[in-house]
Amino acid sequence: MKQKVVSIGDINVANDLPFVLFGGMNVLESRDLAMRICEHYVTVTQKLGIPYVFKASFDKANRSSIHSYRGPGLEEGMKIFQELKQTFGVKIITDVHTAEQAQPVADVVDVIQLPAFLARQTDLVEAMAKTGAVINVKKPQFISPGQIGNIVDKFKEGGNEQVILCDRGTNFGYDNLVVDMLGFGVMKKVSGNAPVIFDVTHALQCRDPFGAASSGRRAQVTELARAGMATGLAGLFIEAHPDPENAKCDGPSALPLAKLEAFLTQIKAIDDLVKSFPELDTEH
């Protein structure tokens, strides 16, 4: 079955092409740390031959606590992104939270991301669609995989069909997430075989029901990522940090930066193997 290709500059993203890595840090903690992390990702992905897009947030507008670190904000965040692009020649993905942010962010980065908690907000979707930028839609934890088709339709009606879909787990009772890997195929089917990527970092989140910050299951990142990529996906979304215990956001789910090369070596081997197989239609 023909898979849709979405192009991020010279990077082609599709379910039957070699996987693209969307990776970086959860939130821009500082200019220097962003440079350090980006450089490490670039070095490793170039060595392994993996197409790469740098990820970070300039504003975590949906933190649980009013006291939690949010990021440097729009103006300073765009300055850091511009320097990263000039220094390393990377493509960049970041999330927007208001309609007013969409165009200024799209003027700097290559992919703008629709956050899971905001994915049904029509005004935001329409503003993002109008930019003409490549879009990454985070599937909300609270909807079924089939419902993502309605979000894709909103972007199409807004004149933008350059949409990538991202699964980051589904609510399983209170304060827990599970990954329904059968849902990957459903997301492909209802979207006309749009590229589907897997956010393994945020799928590892779990919460203290009375706490102000998410916990995580970093010890299981490799097994979950391997399982997801074995289904045949367009990309993997992962965050890493040189000191996860002291990260300002989602450290318990972040891959230790020093483990990135070993981790990606395994993921690439699985992706290469799965995509070497001929397509097998078991429905008919």
Swiss-Prot record:
Its EC number is 2.5.1.55. It comes from the Bacteria. It is found in: Cytoplasm. Keywords: Cytoplasm, Lipopolysaccharide biosynthesis, Transferase. Pathway: Carbohydrate biosynthesis; 3-deoxy-D-manno-octulosonate biosynthesis; 3-deoxy-D-manno-octulosonate from D-ribulose 5-phosphate: step 2/3; Bacterial outer membrane biogenesis; lipopolysaccharide biosynthesis. One of its GO terms (molecular function) is 3-deoxy-8-phosphooctulonate synthase activity. Gene3D superfamilies: Aldolase class I. GO terms for cellular component: cytoplasm. Its main location: cytoplasm. It catalyses: D-arabinose 5-phosphate + phosphoenolpyruvate + H2O = 3-deoxy-alpha-D-manno-2-octulosonate-8-phosphate + phosphate. The keyword Transferase applies. The keyword Endoplasmic reticulum does not apply. GO terms for biological process: keto-3-deoxy-D-manno-octulosonic acid biosynthetic process. NCBIfam families: KDO8P_synth (TIGR01362), PRK05198.1 (NF003543), PRK12457.1 (NF009109). Belongs to the KdsA family. This is 2-dehydro-3-deoxyphosphooctonate aldolase. The gene is kdsA.
